[in-house]
Structures are given as structure tokens and as C-alpha cells.
Design a protein with these regions (language model features):
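Phosphate-group recognition and catalysis centered on beta-loop-alpha active-site segments
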Residues: 1-256
Length: 256
């Protein structure tokens, strides 16, 4: 007689590639996004700033120092200038990222169109909001995202930005929490975003579940499978990670 296993199968979370497959390739580049898709990720997250002439580009930092190894502000350069800036992150990756340049949001949209089963979280950075104003940034970003609007989710630390995105027709929005406290819960309840992002270290200790609401949770930066499984068991649907293939492989082993 065959004995059925009584071991409960773990809940396997979904993966969000944080700035693409950024542990192996330069963050926020088309190469990093392609690599994430090739590794099997169906959700990616990228950061957006505006160039001097108002073109949305994929960049996390307001300056070029860390990723490009040169002085200068993103908002001080036109798109034509930024398109020639190499963002190889040589101090972190050596020559592995050689030749990668700053991509525009429109270039990412074309890549998403070539991968119709994927979704993208588009994080609008506060530096852009401060420099250009919320209305301008939201308008420019949503315009670029129109071809993939059903699969693109505008997110930000700025509650005002995501509220404006909703008001201007964004299908789905996500709020990135700075704090996990009662004030943030009240704001999230009023905003009712489809997604809440949070640094997983800010969650209450296990086995407590994070707030329940009309949102799905996205926890970042998760690289450990045990942490991911614990969070998933507590109701967190997505794990955001730069170590895309590594975490997916470790979680895949749990399905055996």
C-alpha cells in the first residue's frame, strides 16, 4: 500500500526581477531585462527619471556616478546625450556590462511588446517629481506606456504620484512604503492600490501576516529562499530580487 506524504507543499511565490536581472547585469538596462525574461521571470521592476528634454529613461540614481562612473545629473542631459552614456557599473561588474547604455522607457515598451506574457512595474523616482513636477512626469510616463498599459503598473514612494497616475487613467498602481505603521495603513486603505511594496525587514515578525486589503504584497530585496517561503506562507505573493535565476532555482527545488 502506498503511503501518501503528509508534508504540506509550500506556497511558491512569484518573482519580480528588481531592475532586471541586476545581480548579473547592469541594472535598469535592456540587457538586464532580457536576461530576466530568459531566466523565466514574468514580472520586472525598473526605475524612471526624465532627461533634460523630458524623455522618460530607465535610471535609479539622479546622478551618473555609480552606474556610469562619471559626473553629471540625469536631468541635466538630453535624451540624445543619455543614449550614449555607458552604464556598465564597472566597479561592480567589471567588463561584464560593457557597452550597455541608458535606455528610454519607449525602448523598454518595445521589449515588452515582444514578450506579451510579461508585466512591468514602473517606479517613478522622486528626483524626477521634484525637478519636473508630478503632472508632467505622470503625463510623460503614461503616454509612453500606452501600448502596454494593461501590463504596466506605475509605482512610487510618492503617494501623490500614484494617486495622480490613477486619476490620469493608469490601470493599476502600486505604492512603495517608507514605513510600515498605522499611518501608512490608513493611507493605503484610502488609496486602495493593486500592489503594496515593502522592504521585508519592516514586516511584523513571523508568523504574523502583513495587512490584508485589496492589494497584493511585493517584498524586496529577497535573495534567500527560506525567507521567500516564509513570507509567501504569510500572504506575500511576490518577491522582488536582483538574483533572479538563483532565487527561482532555489524555489523551484521546493516543488519537488
Amino acid at each position: 500500500m502506498r503511503t501518501e506524504s503528509t508534508r504540506t507543499r509550500p506556497i511558491i511565490p512569484e518573482i519580480v526581477a528588481h531592475r532586471g536581472y541586476a545581480s548579473r547585469f547592469p541594472e535598469n538596462t535592456l540587457r538586464a531585462v532580457r536576461a530576466a525574461f530568459e531566466a523565466g521571470a514574468t514580472h520586472i521592476e525598473v526605475d524612471v527619471l526624465l532627461s533634460a528634454d523630458g524623455v522618460p529613461v530607465l535610471m535609479h540614481d539622479a546622478t551618473l556616478a555609480r552606474t556610469a562612473g562619471r559626473p553629471g545629473e540625469v536631468a541635466a542631459l538630453t535624451w540624445n546625450d543619455l543614449a550614449r552614456v555607458e552604464v556598465a557599473e564597472r566597479s561592480r561588474l567589471g567588463e561584464a556590462g560593457a557597452g550597455e547604455t541608458v535606455p528610454s522607457l519607449s525602448q523598454l515598451v518595445r521589449l515588452l511588446e515582444a514578450h506579451p506574457d510579461t508585466n512591468a512595474f514602473i517606479e517613478i523616482k522622486r528626483a524626477a517629481l521634484t525637478r519636473f513636477g508630478v503632472e508632467v512626469v505622470i503625463s510623460r510616463v503614461l503616454h509612453e506606456l500606452e501600448p502596454v498599459q494593461e501590463r504596466a503598473i506605475v509605482i512610487s514612494f510618492s503617494g501623490d504620484a500614484v494617486r495622480q497616475a490613477r486619476a490620469h487613467g493608469a490601470r493599476r498602481i502600486g505604492w512603495v512604503l517608507e514605513r510600515y505603521d498605522d499611518d501608512a495603513l490608513s493611507e493605503a486603505s484610502r488609496m486602495a492600490p493593486e500592489f503594496l511594496f515593502c522592504n521585508y525587514t519592516k514586516f511584523p515578525p513571523s508568523p504574523q501576516r502583513p495587512w490584508v486589503g485589496p492589494w497584493d504584497w511585493v517584498a524586496y530585496e529577497v535573495t534567500d529562499a527560506a525567507v521567500a517561503l516564509d513570507l509567501a506562507a504569510r500572504g506575500v505573493r511576490f518577491m522582488e530580487t536582483m538574483a533572479v535565476a538563483e532565487l527561482m532555482s532555489a524555489l523551484g527545488a521546493q516543488r519537488q
